[in-house]
C-alpha cells in the first residue's frame, strides 16, 4: 500500500477535525491507520498509512 493524503474523486483532501475521524476514514478504505497532519497550503488534513492502490491519494494538480 501507499502512505499519503487521502483524496476524494476530485483530487481534494479531507479536512481533519479529529484524529479518530481520519483513522476511521483510512481504515474504512482498508488502510492501516490515519491521523491529522498539517500540510501547507491545505491546512490540517487526513494522512493515511498503507492504503491499497485503488484508493486515491492527493496528487499534483488542482482540487476540482
From Swiss-Prot:
<feature type="disulfide bond">
    <location>
        <begin position="16"/>
        <end position="36"/>
    </location>
</feature>
<dbReference type="InterPro" id="IPR044062">
    <property type="entry name" value="LCN-type_CS_alpha_beta_dom"/>
</dbReference>
<keyword id="KW-0528">Neurotoxin</keyword>
<feature type="disulfide bond">
    <location>
        <begin position="12"/>
        <end position="63"/>
    </location>
</feature>
<protein>
    <recommendedName>
        <fullName>Neurotoxin BTN</fullName>
    </recommendedName>
</protein>
<dbReference type="InterPro" id="IPR018218">
    <property type="entry name" value="Scorpion_toxinL"/>
</dbReference>
<dbReference type="GO" id="GO:0006952">
    <property type="term" value="P:defense response"/>
</dbReference>
<keyword id="KW-0964">Secreted</keyword>
<dbReference type="InterPro" id="IPR002061">
    <property type="entry name" value="Scorpion_toxinL/defensin"/>
</dbReference>
<dbReference type="Pfam" id="PF00537">
    <property type="entry name" value="Toxin_3"/>
</dbReference>
<dbReference type="InterPro" id="IPR036574">
    <property type="entry name" value="Scorpion_toxin-like_sf"/>
</dbReference>
<comment type="function">
    <text>Inhibits sodium channels (Nav).</text>
</comment>
<feature type="disulfide bond">
    <location>
        <begin position="22"/>
        <end position="46"/>
    </location>
</feature>
<keyword id="KW-0872">Ion channel impairing toxin</keyword>
<feature type="disulfide bond">
    <location>
        <begin position="26"/>
        <end position="48"/>
    </location>
</feature>
<dbReference type="GO" id="GO:0019871">
    <property type="term" value="F:sodium channel inhibitor activity"/>
</dbReference>
<comment type="similarity">
    <text>Belongs to the long (4 C-C) scorpion toxin superfamily. Sodium channel inhibitor family. Alpha subfamily.</text>
</comment>
<feature type="domain" description="LCN-type CS-alpha/beta">
    <location>
        <begin position="2"/>
        <end position="64"/>
    </location>
</feature>
<keyword id="KW-0800">Toxin</keyword>
<dbReference type="GO" id="GO:0090729">
    <property type="term" value="F:toxin activity"/>
</dbReference>
<dbReference type="InterPro" id="IPR003614">
    <property type="entry name" value="Scorpion_toxin-like"/>
</dbReference>
<dbReference type="GO" id="GO:0005576">
    <property type="term" value="C:extracellular region"/>
</dbReference>
<keyword id="KW-1015">Disulfide bond</keyword>
<keyword id="KW-0738">Voltage-gated sodium channel impairing toxin</keyword>
Amino acid at each position: 500500500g501507499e502512505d499519503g493524503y487521502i483524496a476524494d474523486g476530485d483530487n481534494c483532501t479531507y479536512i481533519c477535525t479529529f484524529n479518530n475521524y481520519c483513522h476511521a476514514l483510512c481504515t474504512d478504505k482498508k488502510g492501516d491507520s490515519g491521523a491529522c497532519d498539517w500540510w501547507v497550503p491545505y491546512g490540517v488534513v487526513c494522512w493515511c498509512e498503507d492504503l491499497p492502490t485503488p484508493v486515491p491519494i492527493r496528487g499534483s494538480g488542482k482540487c476540482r
